[in-house]
């Protein structure tokens, strides 16, 4: 899951620039995604996730670590899926009238997992079902909110995020 955990913080660090929705509004008059989802953030986040995934692949191959075997496809799907999940959550938040940065417990913690899992199930189901066993799923569900909160607090302290959630 590391390739899925990396893209969001990297997107926050190097985001900015042109919003993915080009500042357009949806039929309800609200922004489609908002200013927080930019092409620079998307590209940097996905590249960082893929890069960390490639490092994992190299480490497992070189040092024979007992970690799930990743592929270039799996790390790409995990990284891209994480950010697509975040964008999907932002779309729904806007429809519900929630503002950028407004806390949305549970959805804020698991959007990346849902996006990464869905994209991987669609495009690489054999890898997904071989790797994401019940114990792995439980570990992901337990670790993700703790990791999410910790990274957001750090982002708040270093002034990358305006809110610590």
From Swiss-Prot:
InterPro entries: CarS (IPR032690), CarS_archaea (IPR002726). The chain crosses the membrane at residues 41-61, 72-92, 103-123, 127-147. Signal peptide: none annotated. It catalyses: 2,3-bis-O-(geranylgeranyl)-sn-glycerol 1-phosphate + CTP + H(+) = CDP-2,3-bis-O-(geranylgeranyl)-sn-glycerol + diphosphate. Pathway: Membrane lipid metabolism; glycerophospholipid metabolism. GO terms for biological process: glycerophospholipid biosynthetic process. One of its GO terms (molecular function) is CDP-2,3-bis-(O-geranylgeranyl)-sn-glycerol synthase activity. Keywords: Cell membrane, Lipid biosynthesis, Lipid metabolism, Magnesium, Membrane, Phospholipid biosynthesis, Phospholipid metabolism, Transferase, Transmembrane, Transmembrane helix. It is an enzyme of class 2 (transferase). It is a multi-pass membrane protein. Its EC number is 2.7.7.67. The keyword Transferase applies. Pfam families: CarS-like. It is found in: Cell membrane. GO terms for cellular component: plasma membrane. Its cofactor is Mg(2+). Catalyzes the formation of CDP-2,3-bis-(O-geranylgeranyl)-sn-glycerol (CDP-archaeol) from 2,3-bis-(O-geranylgeranyl)-sn-glycerol 1-phosphate (DGGGP) and CTP. This reaction is the third ether-bond-formation step in the biosynthesis of archaeal membrane lipids. Belongs to the CDP-archaeol synthase family. This is CDP-archaeol synthase. It comes from Methanoregula boonei (strain DSM 21154 / JCM 14090 / 6A8). The gene is carS.
């Amino acid at each position: 899951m590391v390739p899925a955990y990396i893209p969001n913080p990297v997107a926050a660090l190097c985001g900015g620039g042109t919003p993915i929705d080009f500042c357009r509004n949806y039929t309800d008059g609200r922004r489609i995604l908002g200013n927080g989802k930019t092409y620079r953030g998307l590209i940097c986040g996905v590249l960082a996730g893929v890069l960390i995934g490639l490092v994992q692949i190299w480490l497992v191959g070189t040092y024979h670590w007992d970690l799930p075997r990743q592929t270039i496809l799996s790390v790409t799907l995990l990284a891209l899926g994480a950010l697509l999940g975040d964008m999907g959550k932002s779309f729904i938040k806007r429809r519900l009238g929630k503002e950028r940065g407004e806390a949305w417990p549970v959805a804020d913690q698991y959007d990346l997992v849902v996006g990464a899992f869905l994209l991987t199930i669609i495009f690489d189901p054999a890898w997904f079902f071989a790797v994401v066993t019940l114990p792995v799923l439980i570990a992901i569900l337990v670790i993700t909110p703790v990791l999410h909160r910790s990274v957001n607090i750090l982002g708040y302290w270093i002034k990358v995020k305006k809110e610590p959630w």
